[in-house]
A protein has these predicted regions:
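Well-ordered alpha-helical scaffold segments within catalytic/enzyme domains
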Residues: 27-35, 48-53, 92-106, 155-173, ...
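Acidic/polar, glycine-enriched structural segments that form the non-catalytic walls/loops
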Residues: 1-82, 171-172, 498, 505-508
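Alpha-helical positions within canonical tetratricopeptide repeat
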Residues: 105-106, 181, 247-251, 255, ...
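Acidic/His metal-coordination segments adjacent to aromatic residues that form catalytic metal sites
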Residues: 69-80, 131-148, 195-221, 292-304, ...
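CBM-like carbohydrate-recognition segments
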Residues: 133, 391-404, 434-508
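Aromatic-rich carbohydrate-recognition surfaces in CAZymes
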Residues: 6, 10-16, 81-196, 222-230, ...
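Active-site acid/base region of carbohydrate-active enzymes
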Residues: 30-63, 112-134, 155-224, 247, ...
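Extended ligand-binding clefts on enzyme/binding-domain cores
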Residues: 34-42, 123-151, 222-226, 242, ...
Length: 508
C-alpha cells in the first residue's frame, strides 16, 4: 500500500535514504550498546532523537526539544515556541553527543550554524560589544530571549576546539572560524563589555559574573558557568596559537588563570546554612550574587520563590569543574560539597537527592533536582502543572532531572579513575547505577523527559508514579545527549567532555 511504501522510504529501504541509513553511518553505536544495560534500545532511540532535533530548513540548527513543557495547560489559541528553539548550551550537549556516536558531519554543520546566533553589528535591535551568543533564538536566528549567559558564549569555543582536535575541522578551517566567530567570543569572556538589547539597557558585563547562569534565572558567580568560561578560554588560547595570534593566546590564559584562582574565594562557603550532619556548612553554592559566598545574600525572585538565601541553595553545578578539567575529582572543595548534594535528611524544599526503587533490583537508583527551592514544576498543594493557573505558584516544585544522574555518573567515573580503582568490577557498578537509572527514567516510548516525579506533595492531578516522567519537556534533547555521552565515557574509561588542555593546566 501507499502507506507501507512511505514507511519503507522513511526507514531507508532499498535505494531510499532513511533513518536506518543514518544509524548505519554511526560507527560507535555497536561499542556503546555494550555499555548500556538495556541492550542498546535507549541508545538507538537517542541517536534518532538527537538527529531529529536538527531543523530541516536551517541545517545545523539544533533545538532543545520538539515539545512545549506542560503543553496540556498551554493555550493553543496562538503559537508558542516552547523548547522548539536554539539555546547554545543545549546545542553544545547535543552536538557533542552526536560526535560521541561517530557522526562527523552533523556536528560540523551545527558548528558552522552558530554564526547565526552570535551578536554582532548585524543583530537586529542590538548595540554594544559583539561576540556573545544569544540566549534563545528561533532556528532562523530571530531573537526570542536575550539574557547574557556566559557559558553559552564559552561552549561554541569548546565545541570548535574539540572538532579541531578530532580532525573534523582542519587547521585552515579552524583559523578561519577563530577570526570570524571564536575570537570575538573569547574577547567577550576576557574583557566583558556593554550590552544594549531589549530589557538589557546598557548593562555592563564583567566576567566571570554572568547575567544568568545555566538555569537562566540568577545573576552572579556560578560554578557551572565559570567552569565553562575557563575551559572555553583555554581552548581559545590553543586556537589563537594556531592562528599565530600569540598576544590573544596569552590574554586568554591569563583571564582563565584569574577566574580559576577566584573559584573557591567567590563560590565556596565555609559558613553555610546547611550545617547539620552529614552536611557541615562547607560547600559550593549554586550561585553567589557577589564575591562573598559567606554573606548569605538573597537571590532574585524566580518561579514563585521569594526571599531565598543563597546559602541554603545547592546544586550539582560544581561537578562541571571536574567535567571540563578545571578541578581534580579529588579536589578538597569538590569532595566537601558531595555530602550536601547527597543529604537525603534535608527538608524537601532544599533537598536535592532522591532515590527510586526498581522492581527486581535491590539497590535504589539515584536522581537529583536542579537545586534546592526550585519552583519550576508541579505545585505541591494540588500537583498541577507548572504555571497551570497562569502565574507562578509559590509552592511550585522543580522535580528530579535525569540529566543529573548522568552528570554524577561522569563524576564518579572520573573519581574512581583518579583513585586508581577503575577496573571492570567498579565500572560495572557505575554502569548498573547511573546508566540503568537513566534508562529507567525513559518512558515506554524510549523518550527521556526533562523531569521525573519525586513523590513530594500532592499527586492528585496526574497520579504519577515515582520516577515517571512528568509533563515537562519530553523528549529533552539534553537528557538524551547526557545518556549518550555517559555511555561513550564509560566505553572510553574517561570523561568524553573533558578538555585536555584545561585539565593539563589545572589538575595537578
Amino acid at each position: 500500500t501507499g502507506t507501507q511504501k512511505v514507511l519503507a522510504n522513511f526507514n531507508g529501504a532499498g535505494d531510499a535514504i532513511g533513518w536506518e541509513d543514518y544509524l548505519a553511518s554511526l560507527p560507535a553505536l555497536e561499542a556503546l550498546s555494550k555499555e548500556s544495560t538495556d541492550s542498546g534500545k535507549l541508545l538507538y532511540a537517542s541517536a534518532l532523537v538527537l538527529k531529529a532535533q536538527e531543523d530541516k530548513t536551517y541545517a545545523g540548527g539544533m533545538i532543545a526539544s520538539l515539545s512545549n513543557p506542560w503543553g496540556d495547560t498551554a493555550s493553543a489559541d496562538k503559537a508558542q515556541t516552547g523548547y522548539k528553539a536554539v539555546w547554545p548550551r543545549d546545542f553544545y550537549q547535543v552536538t557533542m553527543a552526536m560526535l560521541a556516536l561517530g557522526d562527523r558531519v552533523t556536528p560540523k554543520v551545527a558548528f558552522e550554524y552558530l554564526e547565526n546566533v552570535q551578536t554582532s553589528d548585524k543583530t537586529p535591535g542590538y548595540s554594544g560589544t559583539p561576540g556573545w551568543f544569544l540566549q534563545k533564538t528561533h532556528v532562523d536566528g530571530k531573537v526570542e530571549w536575550v539574557g547574557v549567559q556566559l557559558d553559552q558564549t564559552a561552549m561554541p569555543i569548546m565545541l570548535g576546539w574539540r572538532l579541531w582536535k578530532e580532525g573534523v575541522l582542519t587547521d585552515a578551517e579552524m583559523t578561519t572560524w577563530y577570526d570570524k566567530m571564536l575570537k570575538p567570543a573569547a574577547n567577550f569572556l576576557t574583557d566583558g563589555g556593554t550590552v544594549n538589547i531589549d530589557w538589557l539597557k546598557n548593562v555592563t558585563i564583567t566576567p566571570p559574573k554572568t547575567i544568568q547562569e545555566r538555569w537562566e534565572e540568577q545573576t552572579g558567580y556560578s560554578p557551572s558557568t565559570t567552569s565553562a568560561i575557563i575551559a572555553g578560554l583555554v581552548a581559545a588560547s590553543d586556537i589563537a596559537k594556531l592562528a599565530k595570534d600569540d598576544e590573544s593566546a596569552a590574554r586568554y590564559l591569563a583571564a582563565a588563570d584569574k577566574y580559576s584562582s577566584g573559584l573557591e574565594k567567590n563560590l565556596y562557603t565555609t559558613s553555610g546554612m546547611l550545617n547539620k550532619a552529614p552536611s557541615d556548612g562547607n560547600y559550593y553554592l549554586r550561585i553567589s550574587a557577589n564575591e562573598d559566598p559567606n554573606d548569605r545574600g538573597l537571590l532574585g525572585v524566580s518561579n514563585g520563590q521569594e526571599n531565598v538565601n543563597e546559602s541554603e541553595v545547592i546544586d550539582g553545578g560544581f561537578l562541571e569543574l571536574v567535567r571540563y578539567g578545571v578541578r581534580s575529582p579529588l579536589n578538597k572543595e569538590i569532595q566537601n560539597t558531595l555530602p550536601e548534594i547527597d543529604d537525603t535528611s534535608l527538608p524537601d524544599i532544599v533537598r536535592v537527592k532522591y532515590e527510586f526503587s526498581v522492581a527486581g533490583k535491590a539497590e535504589k537508583l539515584p536522581g537529583w533536582r536542579r537545586y534546592g527551592k526550585d519552583g519550576y514544576g508541579e505545585d505541591t498543594s494540588a500537583g498541577r502543572g507548572y504555571n497551570a493557573t497562569g502565574k507562578n505558584a509559590p509552592d511550585g516544585r522543580g522535580r528530579v532531572w535525569p540529566i543529573f544522574t548522568g552528570e554524577r555518573g561522569h563524576y564518579e567515573l572520573a573519581r574512581t579513575a583518579a583513585n586508581g580503582k577503575l577496573n571492570d568490577e567498579e565500572l560495572s557498578k557505575l554502569r548498573n547505577t547511573y546508566v540503568t537509572a537513566m534508562e529507567i527514567f525513559a518512558n515506554e516510548g524510549l523518550m527521556i523527559p526533562e523531569q521525573v516525579w519525586d513523590n513530594v506533595g500532592s499527586n492528585q492531578t496526574y497520579n504519577f508514579t515515582a520516577g515517571e516522567g512528568t509533563n515537562s519537556a519530553t523528549p529533552l534533547a539534553w537528557s538524551h545527549a547526557e545518556y549518550v555521552k555517559l555511555l561513550r565515557s564509560y566505553a572510553d574509561k574517561k570523561v568524553w567532555d573533558l578538555n585536555a588542555s584545561t585539565s593539563a593546566r589545572y589538575v595537578k
